[in-house]
Amino acid sequence: MSNAEDHAGTRRDFLYYATAGAGAVATGAAVWPLINQMNPSADVQALASIFVDVSSVEPGVQLTVKFLGKPIFIRRRTEADIELGRSVQLGQLVDTNARNANIDAGAEATDQNRTLDEAGEWLVMWGVCTHLGCVPIGGVSGDFGGWFCPCHGSHYDSAGRIRKGPAPENLPIPLAKFIDETTIQLG
């Protein structure tokens, strides 16, 4: 038996392993970009959460900010707004679901379930009409002291609940919380 015959199997095995390794590396290099493109882009990640300074917002004033490409209405409500919102019975509402991402999904659309704080002073919601996506007019507009969508005539009350018109749902409440007394985090 010659020395060459002893090593013939090992050379062949080496070629198999080298080919398999090169194939695995090539497959990984081809698959990696396909998997990586499913991750959110840097601009989307940067907008996943924003902080809004509300220290200069007086009672009765609305602040509109852009979040994830859509308007967010932040209103510091007056005592009259709060009383008006709390006087509404659930039976008077078109949509009795609170649509508040901060509480249970099936919560009722009471005024307390729609506001950011216990006192009911701060209302934060998406500023997009639930009918066809127009931006409602704020500043105590419409028949119910809240917002009015001029596109098709939807009226929202002082808690952003649909009261009249073709819109099927209340204006939704995004994930939001107070970080401190003057800063709200969205997202």
Curated annotation (Swiss-Prot):
GO terms for cellular component: plasma membrane. It is a single-pass membrane protein. Its main location: membrane. PROSITE patterns: RIESKE (PS51296), TAT (PS51318). It comes from the Bacteria. Binds 1 [2Fe-2S] cluster per subunit. Its EC number is 7.1.1.8. InterPro entries: Rieske_2Fe-2S (IPR017941), Rieske_2Fe-2S_sf (IPR036922), Rieske_Fe-S_prot (IPR014349), Rieske_Fe-S_prot_C (IPR005805), TAT_signal (IPR006311), TAT_signal_bac_arc (IPR019546), Ubiq_cytC_Rdtase_Fe-S_su_TAT (IPR019470), Ubiquinol_cyt_c_Rdtase_Fe-S-su (IPR006317). The chain crosses the membrane at residues 15-35. Disulfide bonds join C134-C151. The Rieske protein is a high potential 2Fe-2S protein. Belongs to the Rieske iron-sulfur protein family. This is Ubiquinol-cytochrome c reductase iron-sulfur subunit. The gene is petA.
